[in-house]
């Protein structure tokens, strides 16, 4: 009888221990699963944050359009001046650029003389200063002037964008350190485009009949520059 009692005591003790062990194991397993889940969530968050931190926002381009103020340079066959046509083109280009949130754009739309417009440019921390002109003197075609080597980039893009739209000669980009606004502007990049020769009737006709096209070429100049940043 004594042996039977001892056996029963051992049997119940064993069962009790087994229940505790099973409960403990279940708790530990559950804890491990929760820990793993939390760890996965943290990894996911880190991954998302890492992805966000690698996205780069390009800075907006600060642009100043400075159309010709030469009111006495008259177009062959027309009662219209270089200043008239270039202000029309500049305003159209301004409207295109203004609608595009990649750009902050300014314009001399009140015929400010060169000294005043250059002073304004120098107060605005401008990235790209583009002067808009047409040419005279018996030549033909398009050309762009730049100051020193730092602005050949703007000159190159301006000429390439415009040359897509006409079949007149291309006269290339040229360094010129004597133009007042190029010499005195503190913009990071500065250039002066001579679209075509207004003393050639066929080129004067082209300019007057294609204001929107000239404005589009200016707009595309800065799109291309922005995309290359």
Model-flagged regions — what are they?
Residues 69-72, 110-115, 134-139, 149-152, ...:
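Solvent-exposed loop/turn segments at secondary-structure junctions
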Residues 13-14:
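C-terminal motif of bacterial Sec signal peptides marking the signal peptidase cleavage site
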Residues 2-8:
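Sec-dependent signal peptide recognition
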């Amino acid at each position: 009888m004594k042996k039977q009692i001892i056996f029963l005591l051992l049997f119940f003790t064993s069962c009790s221990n087994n229940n505790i062990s099973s409960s403990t194991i279940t708790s530990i397993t559950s804890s491990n699963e929760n820990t793993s889940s939390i760890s996965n969530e943290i990894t996911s968050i880190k991954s998302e944050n890492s992805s966000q931190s690698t996205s780069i926002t390009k800075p907006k381009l600060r642009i100043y359009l400075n159309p010709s103020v030469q009111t006495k340079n008259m177009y062959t066959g027309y009662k219209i001046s270089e200043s008239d046509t270039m202000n029309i083109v500049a305003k159209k280009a301004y409207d295109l650029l203004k609608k595009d949130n990649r750009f902050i754009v300014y314009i001399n739309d009140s015929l400010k003389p060169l000294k005043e417009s250059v002073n304004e440019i120098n107060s605005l921390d401008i990235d790209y200063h583009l002067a808009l002109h047409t040419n005279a003197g018996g030549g033909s075609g398009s050309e762009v002037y730049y100051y020193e080597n730092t602005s050949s980039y703007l000159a190159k893009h301006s000429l390439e964008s415009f040359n897509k739209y006409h079949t007149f000669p291309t006269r290339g980009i040229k360094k010129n350190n004597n133009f007042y606004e190029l010499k005195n502007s503190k913009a990071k990049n500065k250039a002066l485009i001579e679209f075509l020769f207004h003393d050639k009737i066929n080129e004067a006709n082209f300019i007057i009949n294609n204001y929107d096209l000239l404005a589009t070429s200016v707009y595309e100049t800065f799109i291309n520059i922005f995309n290359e940043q």
